[in-house]
A protein has these predicted regions:
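N-terminal module-boundary/linker segments of secreted carbohydrate-active enzymes
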Residues: 1-26, 30
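Structural recognition of the beta-strand scaffold that forms the well-ordered cores
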Residues: 10-16, 45-51, 89-94, 135-140, ...
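Aromatic-lined carbohydrate-binding/catalytic grooves of carbohydrate-active enzymes
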Residues: 32-148, 152
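Glycan-recognition surfaces
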Residues: 120-123, 164, 168, 172-262, ...
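Carbohydrate-binding surface patches
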Residues: 250-253, 258-260, 300-344
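C-terminal beta-strand-rich structural cap/linker in extracellular carbohydrate-active enzymes
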Residues: 363-392
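Flexible, polar/low-complexity N-terminal or interdomain linker segments that lie immediately upstream
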Residues: 386-431
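Catalytic cysteine-centered active loop of the rhodanese-like fold, especially the PTP/DSP P-loop
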Residues: 440, 449-494
Length: 494
């Protein structure tokens, strides 16, 4: 078996969704591909240009996919060809069920109806990956969720077909499962990467939520198989300091570095962040190990303020480590660390600041002052090392399906004092909502506990119109410490 058929390190590139959603076109894709070259990003390793949802145009009488003629008058194979002509790789999108997320949320109508892989797995995958020559495929789950499909069964079927194409064509293909939560241990043997949390938003709490979502998942990260924290929100409104922390933590976690902004409008300061070759090397380290926190600081009320994370480089229990000092708070904070706490034993041979690119004094005790929402990252080498126990690794993570409760159960919980939360947009909420429901759009739930419900034991029932946003909301709230969250799912009459 050729090792070249499988990518060993996390993906790097650009994807269309965060910037365009379904408002994408052949011209826009080519502009961003050109920008990967002109900005020098491709030289740094950003080589994938991935087309997300928004290109479908239904199916013909033989079940073959059609493509949106206004957005893609020449079809989509031209995009794979164009990417390859630039020395890039091309990615494509599909859905594990019948209807795409764009159909459900972006008014794609007939264009997104019945265009998912369900019932057309071999036909579509062979077209995308063999006939058209795409190198990557992301498979979403909006339609699969609505159909009530078993995700392990369906994604495993898809993965087997992709693997057959991979070996038949002798091409490296990358398969991403997009289920908006960790699917379960089975996914490691099926996909190259998998989403672990709700969709990322362009704000700092959402960035840190993504990081928190994979704290217990380090055991599932390794060469060729990584936890996916979602496309980065760099270039979409974060401060430069927050972009720096965002990028740093993605590199520490060995997760795909996929940009999701307009590359033609990036500032030099932002480009310098995402072109930091020393940080990219941390992300692309051959051992592909995930960082984990070893120390943390909390407020008097228990709010997490700061952490120190370590990442082994080259191998487990290495004497070379990346150490991240992270300040989540809005005040400067000084973080202290003894080298042995990070498993670094004996004489310290080198200490390098990966943002200032300076060699520092070799010391065994660190005292680092970190500014609000900022990060400091050192690469440290010692004479020897010992194991540091990852306290977050509690064994195999049990996958808990997001099971719906009935309307009857939901109303009973509300009658007993539960909060009923509509996670749709304010506009959707105003048009029609369930009686007694409060409106907290999914996009603002990251800071929900700080502004709305200080008691994390509050019983909460979440719903939307189709199921995806409320499924993600349940996942997000549970990651943020809410213990009693119930999923009503999609309420079709809304």
């Amino acid at each position: 078996m050729s090792q070249n058929l499988y990518r060993r390190t996390p993906l790097m590139g650009w994807a269309s969704w965060n910037y365009c959603r379904t408002n994408i076109s052949e011209e826009k894709m080519k502009v961003q591909m050109d920008a990967l070259i002109s900005t020098g990003l491709a030289e740094c390793g950003y080589e994938y240009a991935n087309l997300d949802d928004g290109f479908f145009g239904g199916r013909d009488e033989n079940g073959r996919l059609l493509f949106n003629k206004e957005r893609f008058p020449n079809g989509i194979k031209v995009l794979a060809d164009y990417a390859h002509s630039l020395g890039l790789k091309a990615g494509i999108y599909s859905e594990g069920g019948d209807n795409t997320c764009g159909f459900l949320y972006d008014n794609e109508g007939a264009n997104g109806t019945g265009v998912g892989l369900y019932g057309h797995e071999e036909q579509d995958l062979n077209m995308f990956l063999d006939e058209f020559g795409f190198d990557f495929i992301k498979v979403d789950w909006c339609g699969g969720l609505r159909l009530g499909l078993d995700e392990e069964t369906q994604y495993t079927k898809i993965g087997k077909i992709i693997d057959e194409i991979r070996h038949r064509t002798n091409r490296q293909l990358v398969f991403n499962v997009c289920r908006w939560q960790f699917p379960g241990a089975w996914v490691v043997n099926v996909a190259d990467s998998w989403r672990t949390g709700a969709d990322i938003n362009p704000n700092f709490p959402s960035v840190m939520y993504q990081v928190d979502s994979i704290k217990p998942l380090a055991r599932y990260c390794g060469p060729g198989h990584v936890n996916d924290l979602d496309m980065m929100q760099i270039g979409n409104g974060l401060t430069l300091t927050e972009e720096k922390t965002h990028f740093s933590m993605w590199c520490m976690m060995s997760t795909p570095l996929m940009l999701g902004c307009d590359l033609t409008k990036l500032s030099e300061a932002t480009l310098n962040i995402i072109k930091n070759k020393e940080l990219i090397a941390i992300d692309q380290d051959e051992a592909c190990l995930q960082a984990f926190p070893i120390k943390d600081w909390h407020s008097e009320k228990g709010k997490l303020l700061a952490e120190i994370w370590i990442k082994d480089l080259g191998k487990k229990y290495s004497n070379q480590k990346a150490i991240a000092f992270v300040n989540r708070s809005i005040e400067p904070i000084t973080l202290d660390l003894k080298a042995e706490e990070a498993g670094l034993i004996g004489k310290i041979l080198s200490v390098r600041d990966l943002w200032t690119h300076e060699e520092l004094t070799c010391i065994n005790e660190f005292s680092v002052t970190v500014q609000p929402h900022d990060v400091v990252i050192y690469k440290v080498e010692s004479e020897s090392s010992v194991e540091v126990v990852n306290q977050w690794d509690q064994g195999e993570v049990e996958f808990v399906a997001t099971n719906k409760i009935s309307m009857e159960t939901a109303l009973k919980l509300v009658k007993e004092g539960a909060m009923l939360i509509d996670v749709r947009s304010p506009e959707e909420y105003e048009q029609k909502h369930l009686e007694g429901a409060l409106n907290y759009p999914y996009s603002v739930l990251d800071g929900f506990g700080d502004v709305a419900v200080p008691d994390k034991n509050t019983t909460i029932v979440v719903y939307c119109s189709t199921g995806k946003r409320s499924s993600q909301a349940k996942n997000l709230l549970e990651t943020n410490g809410f213990d009693n969250v119930y999923y009503l799912g999609g309420v079709e009459e809304l």
